[in-house]
């Protein structure tokens, strides 16, 4: 996409900052595994030492957000208490222990004697990350960037300005004690800078938006830089005729209420008509007790769901304690609904019929398709990636939770001894194309 007239040209100051990040990123990309491991551990220690200041800064942001009437879903994302911060720090430490994503040989092939081709993983370069009320995203993204040898330009929402600044200062202080240049990461502070970031093709290699549907769509429509992300998280849970009702209820409650503001929480519950009466008899009181507002189709309303779901509801990412409920005739009815309304993020089935479950797993074209477990498992940390920069719902890779592997590209290296193409064109030499051990 070409940028729109509403996206400003980058200022001289922003161009200078981006160039500094890129220069530092070039050195970072040539650092070794041990240097980057030590950098992450130093970042974790700095966050721990600054935890009181970070939580205090977050309280300032929360108080301001309350007075401005910030939506409850955004308030939940904005909150960074000691427990949430400690979890992020632990994720950073785990990330330091993961296998180095750089320098991995993916292909090793002899083209001819003494003419050997390799494909090696290398950093992308500089990440441009734009996110809304998610201060923990600063920790996740900067740690993933450093571990994968990438620089990062970050712009958080103004509602988290105090928290973001406190976090980035701690992270830079940690890096200053290592061989990694703290200039590899930078925090943008104004909306004008975040818009102008979209014009930094040549200095930024990938844009990663984390926020509302509107934010992601705007970025996708207004930059020439590749964009990684998803615009919606409309996730579905289908309860099959062969579902264990107790298990189904536990999974449904967890998928909706464990963290309703997350993009991997369910927005629609699909129930096979044969179990709908017995399941809803159990589920409606449980959901109401958990504070969930239920919206249903005519069949589910006849079974006790009080409010009607509109056509718009099936296509809505609530990010709140609201759940649309629909009774379907069979698996095909569930699949039809998912094909029509899914954002291709994560869908799940509860069933003790293996054949039905396999059919669901094969037929649903989403980044994550689960059987007998909560959709909330769609997360880089829970997948063992250490952390994630976001979840991609695009078909081309990377797809799903994007961790270290999604932040590297590859380079072909060819080593020869004076080889020239003319010798192969005239038939004097022949290719061997022999694969060698990786």
From Swiss-Prot:
InterPro entries xref list: Ald_DH/histidinol_DH (IPR016161), Ald_DH_C (IPR016163), Ald_DH_N (IPR016162), Aldehyde_DH_dom (IPR015590), G-glutamylP_reductase_CS (IPR020593), Glu-5-SA_DH (IPR012134), GPR_dom (IPR000965)
A GO biological-process term: L-proline biosynthetic process
Enzyme nomenclature, EC number: 1.2.1.41
Keyword Iron: no
Top EC class for this record: oxidoreductase
Positions of disulphide bridges: none
Secretion signal, residue range per the UniProt entry: none
Molecular function in Gene Ontology: glutamate-5-semialdehyde dehydrogenase activity; NADP binding
GO cellular component, one term: cytoplasm
Catalytic activity field: L-glutamate 5-semialdehyde + phosphate + NADP(+) = L-glutamyl 5-phosphate + NADPH + H(+)
Alphabetically ordered keywords of this record: Amino-acid biosynthesis, Cytoplasm, NADP, Oxidoreductase, Proline biosynthesis
Protein's pathway: Amino-acid biosynthesis; L-proline biosynthesis; L-glutamate 5-semialdehyde from L-glutamate: step 2/2
Primary localisation category: cytoplasm
SUPFAM superfamilies the UniProt entry points to: ALDH-like (SSF53720)
Gene3D superfamilies: Aldehyde Dehydrogenase, Chain A, domain 1, Aldehyde Dehydrogenase, Chain A, domain 2
Source species, domain of life: Bacteria
Subcellular location as annotated: Cytoplasm
Protein task: Catalyzes the NADPH-dependent reduction of L-glutamate 5-phosphate into L-glutamate 5-semialdehyde and phosphate. The product spontaneously undergoes cyclization to form 1-pyrroline-5-carboxylate.
Family under the similarity heading: Belongs to the gamma-glutamyl phosphate reductase family.
The protein, known as: Gamma-glutamyl phosphate reductase
Lineage, opening ranks: Bacteria, Bacillati, Cyanobacteriota, Cyanophyceae, Synechococcales
